[in-house]
Amino acid sequence: DVPSANANANNQRTAAAKPQANAEASS
Protein backbone atom coordinates (compact mmCIF):
# COMPACT_ATOMS: atom_id res chain seq x y z
CA ASP A 1 0.00 0.00 0.00
CA VAL A 2 2.71 2.49 -0.90
CA PRO A 3 0.42 5.09 -2.55
CA SER A 4 -1.78 5.01 0.54
CA ALA A 5 1.22 5.59 2.77
CA ASN A 6 2.32 8.51 0.61
CA ALA A 7 -1.13 10.06 0.75
CA ASN A 8 -1.11 9.65 4.52
CA ALA A 9 2.25 11.40 4.80
CA ASN A 10 1.05 14.21 2.55
CA ASN A 11 -2.09 14.69 4.65
CA GLN A 12 -0.05 14.86 7.84
CA ARG A 13 2.39 17.34 6.28
CA THR A 14 -0.49 19.53 5.10
CA ALA A 15 -2.19 19.39 8.49
CA ALA A 16 1.06 20.31 10.21
CA ALA A 17 1.61 23.26 7.88
CA LYS A 18 -1.84 24.78 8.35
CA PRO A 19 -1.39 26.16 11.91
CA GLN A 20 1.96 27.61 10.85
CA ALA A 21 0.39 29.34 7.84
CA ASN A 22 -2.40 30.70 10.04
CA ALA A 23 0.09 32.00 12.58
CA GLU A 24 2.11 33.74 9.88
CA ALA A 25 -1.01 35.30 8.40
CA SER A 26 -2.23 36.62 11.74
CA SER A 27 1.07 38.03 12.95
From Swiss-Prot:
Represses female sexual receptivity and stimulates oviposition. This peptide has a low activity. Residues 1-17 have a biased composition (Low complexity). One of its GO terms (cellular component) is extracellular region. Keywords: Behavior, Secreted. Main cells of the accessory glands of males (paragonial gland). Its main location: secreted. It comes from Drosophila funebris. It is found in: Secreted. This is Paragonial peptide PS-1. Residues 1-27 are annotated as: Disordered.
